[in-house]
């Protein structure tokens, strides 16, 4: 009986996660590294998909914005944990205490292994850099 209950729970969790991804907003088209941080972040905020206040600002001025509660964003089929960006002299972004990473930079942090993410990004023809963050957490980043 316990085995059947575990299977049912696993099935329910799997179906729930698939349902969430079915209603996800894909944003990989904007990760072509030809935009600015403002052009990447502002439409997501105006659509009500992304928080307007960063959850964190790094010393290098990279701002981390969470998707709003109930919103699911994806990039190359991977669920987006956070959108990261900075653009100099733009009121959407708060400066950090150190030297800014660039005049404009943007990207996402996704739930996925770096090798799998890098493969999908390359296959899509994007110029984005892929960076390992932690096990199964990967950054996709553009500095146009």
Predicted regions and their residues:
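N-terminal Sec-dependent export signals
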Residues: 12, 22-24
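Long, charged/polar, surface-exposed segments that mediate recognition or autoinhibition
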Residues: 67-123
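N-terminal secretory signal peptides
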Residues: 25-83
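Bacterial N-terminal signal peptides that target proteins for export
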Residues: 1-11
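Short, ordered beta-strand-loop transition motifs
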Residues: 55-61, 97-104, 129-137
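N-terminal signal peptide c-region/cleavage motif recognized by signal peptidases
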Residues: 17-21
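Short, extreme N-terminal segment that most often corresponds to the first beta-strand
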Residues: 25-33, 108-109, 138-144
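C-terminal partner/receptor-binding element of secreted or periplasmic proteins
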Residues: 118-144
């Amino acid at each position: 009986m316990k085995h059947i209950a575990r299977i049912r729970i696993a099935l329910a969790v799997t179906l729930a996660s698939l349902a969430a991804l079915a209603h996800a907003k894909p944003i990989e088209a904007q990760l072509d590294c030809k935009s600015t941080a403002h052009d990447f972040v502002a439409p997501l905020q105006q659509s009500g998909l992304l928080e307007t206040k960063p959850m964190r600002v790094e010393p290098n001025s990279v701002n981390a914005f969470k998707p709003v509660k109930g919103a699911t964003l994806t990039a190359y089929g991977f669920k987006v944990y956070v959108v990261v960006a900075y653009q100099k002299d733009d009121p959407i972004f708060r400066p950090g205490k150190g030297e800014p990473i660039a005049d404009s930079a943007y990207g996402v942090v996704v739930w996925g292994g770096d090798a799998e993410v890098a493969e999908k990004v390359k296959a899509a023809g994007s110029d984005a850099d892929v960076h390992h963050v932690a096990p199964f957490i990967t950054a996709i980043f553009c500095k146009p």
